[in-house]
């Protein structure tokens, strides 16, 4: 069945999959952002000076401070560093995930999925292309971390051995620099693996979401409506109209729509009468039927909400257009005449070229 899934996923399929948590996301990229942000914060703002200051105060007071006061002070300093650190980690993990998912929350992924306990499905995942990809990725990561460790060892081995004669503060400063250097070197060595994994994950996700032609057709019917039902609906609309109304539509110069609730037909033949007349006057379902029939017989339908409402309020069928509205109606008639004449002028030279 999967071999028949050759069509690209539709926008609706991608949105539904994102709600289920099945959209493209590179977990390693999220972990890399989280690690980099956390280490950068600890190296930049983490310090033992405040903790050491508390100890100095206690010693200066001849240990008169109670254990409760000391614990409370240490707890306050810990919160001062821990809360921003946790918020930063939350942002560094959530923002890349939301960007990859198009800011769609996977609400349906929170529901329990009993099919995940199916041993057959587990066996399929065990021998899938994604498992092969993860195995190769793990080996590449291991190689890149070994390379990063070798680079850091060759570059910082002097600093490492110099700590044998250093004090506590000096050792803390050196290890802070070494930690940042090790993380940055590992990320730099693993950058290519990260990009390759993201590309492979994207193509595997798109492959899993591919649809067969029947699924695409079924989804189009759900979104746009079944063509057979739409055709039947048009036929019903036609049956709503009487033969007199159909005749009035055919003789109209144009139909002014609102765009679905009101349709007003304009009859205008200067050789018979100099003033336009209201030939069609329908609302709601009959208005939709008028539009459908006008499009069928080739009568222009112009959407002008303001004019349609005004004519509907002030006129009835077979009324002559009043002086208050005649300017707007004549403007539409002149514009329509110009458009039709321009179309004829384009067609005429083409016919002459064919004859020559």
UniProtKB/Swiss-Prot annotation:
Gene label: spaS
Cellular localisation: Cell inner membrane
Protein name per UniProt: Surface presentation of antigens protein SpaS
Family under the similarity heading: Belongs to the type III secretion exporter family.
One of the GO BP terms on file: protein secretion
Pfam family, any one: Bac_export_2
Membrane topology category: Multi-pass membrane protein
Keyword entries, A-Z: Cell inner membrane, Cell membrane, Membrane, Transmembrane, Transmembrane helix, Virulence
InterPro entries: BsaZ-like (IPR006307), T3SS_substrate_exporter (IPR006135), T3SS_substrate_exporter_C (IPR029025)
NCBIfam families xrefs: FlhB_rel_III (TIGR01404), PRK08156.1 (NF006017)
Chief location of this protein within or outside the cell: membrane
PANTHER family: FLAGELLAR BIOSYNTHETIC PROTEIN FLHB (PTHR30531), SURFACE PRESENTATION OF ANTIGENS PROTEIN SPAS (PTHR30531:SF14)
Biological function: Involved in a secretory pathway responsible for the surface presentation of determinants needed for the entry of Salmonella species into mammalian cells.
Gene Ontology cellular component annotations, sorted alphabetically: plasma membrane
Membrane-traversing stretches: 29-49, 72-92, 132-152, 179-199, 261-281
